[in-house]
């Protein structure tokens, strides 16, 4: 455990946008953004909103992207891998049959760091290991075809009656949605994989049935340090509620704006610290995907 006197791990970023304003307090252990302009979210049309945030330096951790609004809009809880260097984007989905507008100040975005482990798993047929260096999630694949109908009021539920295959204490296996599916209208509630199995709650806001073929990746599993998931008396500590029963407390890191890397407004300029596509190693994520899983 890190002592209070030790310097905090540093996360450096650049922030270039007029669509959000930074609302984090000084020395806050997370980044907070609030929308500056109206956002129109139409039914059955996932809205991918650039935040203007690019990480240029990250310690050995990953990040969770969360969104909050009082409107009838589902904000995809995104996994941002430590090796991702593209622009971080939030995915919004309309839960109703009519357009919903988020006016100035009605959408709050948070980026929080967490520590994780990649355990050597025993043979689990429906889990595949991370694809890139510094990726945090194991993909969950379906073994048989299934159809997720359009969501009305109730989620489409899948139960995997398999004990969590990861290490025991001090880690918790969390199921998170894939950004590639969220960009097509398919999202899940964050859930904990326990000794009795894993329950997945899917929401299909695309307006069309979605067919998952055998081998399709439907979500991802992250083995999070247990101290990030508050239980018992610790639930009284400050936290973010990722889902009913899942109370998340971020890692203590120092977010600092990278003044040495200034993102230009012109499309001709090379993005900050992003690997050149022609020379980047195949095992580096770089700008691929939306932070974790890709399209």
Curated annotation (Swiss-Prot):
Name under which the protein is recorded: Deoxyuridine 5'-triphosphate nucleotidohydrolase
Molecular functions (GO terms): dUTP diphosphatase activity; metal ion binding
Pfam families named among the record's database cross-references: dUTPase
Gene: DUT
UniProt similarity note: Belongs to the dUTPase family.
Requisite cofactors: Mg(2+)
Ranges for region Disordered: 260-295
Enzymatic reactions: dUTP + H2O = dUMP + diphosphate + H(+)
Keyword list, A-Z: Hydrolase, Magnesium, Metal-binding, Nucleotide metabolism
EC number of the protein: 3.6.1.23
Disulfide-bonded cysteines: none
Biased composition (Basic and acidic residues): 260-272
